Amino acid sequence: MRKLFTSESVTEGHPDKICDQISDAVLDAILDKDPNGRVACETAVTTGMVMVMGEISTKCYVDIPKLVRETIRGIGYDRAKYGFDCETCSVITSIDEQSVDIAMGVDEALESKKGEMDKLDAVGAGDQGMMFGFATNETKEYMPMPIEMAHKLSRRLSEVRKNGTLPYLRPDGKTQVTVEYENGKPVRIDAIVISTQHGPEVYLEQIEKDIKEHVIKVIVPSELLDENTKYFINPTGRFVVGGPQGDSGLTGRKIIVDTYGGYGRHGGGAFSGKDPTKVDRSAAYAARWVAKNLVAAGVADKLEIQLAYAIGVAKPVSISVDTFGTGKMTDEEIVSIVNKVFDLRPGAIIRDLDLRRPIYKQVAAYGHFGRTDIDVPWERLDKVEEIKKHI
C-alpha cells in the first residue's frame, strides 16, 4: 500500500521561531545563574517591537533587553533593510512572579504531603496534561523522514545564508517535504517546497537554480529523488518582506515543527520558555527518550508513548503505548518494561536527564528531537541494554 505524508520546518528567522529562541535565551540565562529558577517566559514580535512577558521566580538578575537584542542579532536581523533590526527595535518587558498556588504543588507534591518520604516525590508536576513521545527506525535519527528531511533543509538554508554561499538570502524561510511510503517504509520524496526570504535584487530564476544546487542536492540523497519529484521554490514568485515585518510571531506557535511533524500525536503543550518543572517540556523530552530507547532495543519498529500527569502529583496518572502493529510484544508488556526501567516522576526526569542546565536555546529552532548536530540527553541511547534484559 502506498501513501504520502508531509511535514514542514521553518528557519530560525521565522517570526514564531524568533520568539521561541528569545524565550529560551531568557530561560538559559536564568538557569545558568539559578538552576532552581522557575520560568514561564512568553515572547511576541511584530514590526519594530518585541514584548517579553510571563512569570519568573529567581534569585538572580538577567538583562532581558540585552538578551533579546543578542538573540535577534545572532539570527541575522541586524540591519534596517531586513525590516527588523536588533539595534533599533523596541523591547517591552512585563514579568511577574510564579503563582504561589502553583509553586505550592510543585515544591511539595501530593505524595510528600501524605508522608511518602521519597525525595523525588517532593517535586510535583507543574501542571496537568498529557505528553507524547515517538520514535521510528525509518531513519538513523529514529525520526519520521518527512520532518527530519524538512529540518535538514531549513538548517541548510541558514547555513548558506550565513557562510556567504547565497548572500542574498534573508533569515525567514520555510521548508516542506512530502515522502511516499510503501508498506510503511519511505521509498521516495514526492515533493519539496522551499520558501526563503531574499533581497530585492535577485530574480526567481536565480533563486530556483541556487536552492536546487546548494540546498536540495546537498541535503537530499539522490536515490530519494526521481523525474516525478515536484519542486516548489518560492511559489508566490517573491519573498522580500518577511520576518516580524511580514507576520507577527508568538512563542509556542510551532509545536508540530518542534516535535514529529504531525507523524506522532501531540499533547498540545509548547516547550520554549518553560523550566523543567513544567511537564509540558520535561515529560515530552522523557517520552521521546523512552520511545527512542525502546525502538533501538528492538521492542518495535515504530512506537508512541503517552504520559499523563496531575498538577502537584509526582507519579504519572497513566502510561500507554501504541506500536502500530510493529511491536514484538504486547502493549501491556511494554508498559511493564517502561515502569521497570524508567522513573517518570518530574523530579526523576530532571535528575536523570540533568535538565536544570542552560541547554534549551539550542533546540528552539530546527527541532527538539532527532538532533545529531548537538548533544541533548533525551536523545541518548543509554537504556537499550537494560531494556533488552526485560524482553
From Swiss-Prot:
Pathway: Amino-acid biosynthesis; S-adenosyl-L-methionine biosynthesis; S-adenosyl-L-methionine from L-methionine: step 1/1. It is found in: Cytoplasm. Binds 2 divalent ions per subunit. Gene3D superfamilies: 3.30.300.10. ATP binds at H14, D172, G173, K174, R238, F239, D247, R253, K254, A270, K274. Pfam families: S-AdoMet_synt_C, S-AdoMet_synt_M, S-AdoMet_synt_N. One of its GO terms (cellular component) is cytosol. This is S-adenosylmethionine synthase. It comes from Clostridium botulinum (strain Hall / ATCC 3502 / NCTC 13319 / Type A).
